[in-house]
């Protein structure tokens, strides 16, 4: 008991002085309709919650309907308006690439080349295969490469965090915008899992952390019981409502504890 009483004030003190690493920081958000402040599915977005809870100043450049090929434009606009003054960037996009049937593609193009090499013997030109990042704007992985090449060159000293797309069910806006659920392949024959896995792979290719919201936030619109987290049970289980955004925000708040915001 004496030991407990002696240790408890120390523990209490440690809790009192602890500060979330993203507290009071300036964060740019790139993405699509789930992040776009003009989307009416919710009054509050996940970044609004983070603003309230952590005092984050949000700079939001997300636009509804956009795909990975729009990230360079969003990055340019952010840099033009704020320069190097932001602390970090969060990128949450990809569901529209799936819906629009963008081909997955490859991460690299491979070529036969020669390189100078010597190990235990005199150096000499040696035939090797060499990979080059694929910059194909018509493929998903090519678009991610183009985007991250742009963002990491613009912001070499900033934290860049990727978020995987969340699960999606039907979205029925009108007869010309009638999107089916994720248990169907898209026009190019791919399930959404391939698009999610590609974001995870990009983390290793580009040395950026990824938060797997698809798994961690718990939103699963395929079940009627989870319709409560989305805009409309019958017509829109793609866009989270206020309750859904709060759940995303709570997940992010705890996941971001493991990442520095500024270096």
What is the predicted function of each stretch?
Residues 6, 19-21, 50-52, 152, ...:
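A generic structural signal for short, solvent-exposed coil/turn residues
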Residues 1-16:
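Bacterial Sec-dependent N-terminal signal peptides
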Residues 6, 28, 232-234:
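A generic, residue-level signal for flexible/boundary positions that often mark functional hotspots
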Residues 14-64, 69-85, 89, 224-226:
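Serine-esterase "nucleophile elbow" of acetyl-processing enzymes
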